[in-house]
């Protein structure tokens, strides 16, 4: 899950207490991005690869990994819940980057498994967030709020990864 930097509302959509809150936030990725184009490109690339591998390792823990749009890791192993006072997600738009594909509006319970449904609910409740889900079925989906359709937009991108 990617949430805006400095935002705190995302906490309303996460079961508390968070089992693996990162405090202070892991900021190595953010710092490395700021150093892009540094004098020693090879060393920078190696440092960036190590930082990415460290964050990728956190995704192996059951639950969501949360980071800011500035690349600070806030938590991992987080359990997503519906935000208090907000309705459950009932429909969303689904698209694929395939020529001739048209958007479909579906019930999110029919799309993927628990990870996909949790991500869709998170974005439904936290409209400034983006969720990236790699499902066990091989699907890779990006969830974001669409102000045009006023609903969650799930964009299946696994065909781009082939």
Please annotate each region the language model reported.
Residues 1-162:
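Divalent-cation
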């Amino acid at each position: 899950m990617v949430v805006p930097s400095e935002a705190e509302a995302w906490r309303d959509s996460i079961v508390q207490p968070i089992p693996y809150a990162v405090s202070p936030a892991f900021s190595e990725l953010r710092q490395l991005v700021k150093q892009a184009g540094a004098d020693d490109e090879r060393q920078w690339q190696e440092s960036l690869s190590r930082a990415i591998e460290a964050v990728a390792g956190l995704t192996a823990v059951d639950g969501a990994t949360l980071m800011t749009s500035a690349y600070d890791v806030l938590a991992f192993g987080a359990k997503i819940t519906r935000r208090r006072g907000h309705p459950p997600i009932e429909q969303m738009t689904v698209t694929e980057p395939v020529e001739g594909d048209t958007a479909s509006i579906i019930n999110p319970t029919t799309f993927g498994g628990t990870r996909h449904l949790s991500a869709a609910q998170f974005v439904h409740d936290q409209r400034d967030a983006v969720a990236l889900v790699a499902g066990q079925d091989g699907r890779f989906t990006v969830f974001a709020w669409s102000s045009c359709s006023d609903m969650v937009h799930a964009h299946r991108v696994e065909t781009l990864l082939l």
